[in-house]
Amino acid sequence: MGLTMENKYKIDNPKNIRIEGMQDTDIKGLHTIFKNEGCIDSENLFADNEKAIALDDVQTRLSKRNHTDKKASADILICIVKNKYLLADAKFRQENVKNFKLQDLNPKLNCSKNIVLSDEFRFDNAFYVLLKKKILSETNRRYLKQQFKSSPLYRFVNTEDFWNLFH
């Protein structure tokens, strides 16, 4: 079944957003980011000319610089038109949806938003959790919808549904 809303977003170049601790090398192609996060090739529909920020790399650098434990954050920040951004957490290695808890995702959301230093960019109230197609069955979609009914900003999608939001 999946999402029916296609072409909802247009990816924008992330070079103008300021992120605490970000370097130019943190801007990567979505295909590469997805592959590094464990997305299988047959489901990885994005191209490397579609750019995003690999927040894991930023968080690793911040923790080393500050001599602290690495904070939980989203894996990916995608700039979209009109100075907005989306966050996504890649869970391609996840085999069970029963492990998702609101109290685990909220700190990732807050940490990710807090390292965005650009006042002119605003969060688009969409935190996507990306899963393999075989894990996100209709039964599992219903379970997640029920579990997260109090928080509609969390959206559980497979890579095809996520890709369709942009194409």
Predicted regions and their residues:
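Short, charge-rich binding segments
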Residues: 67-68, 78-80, 118-120
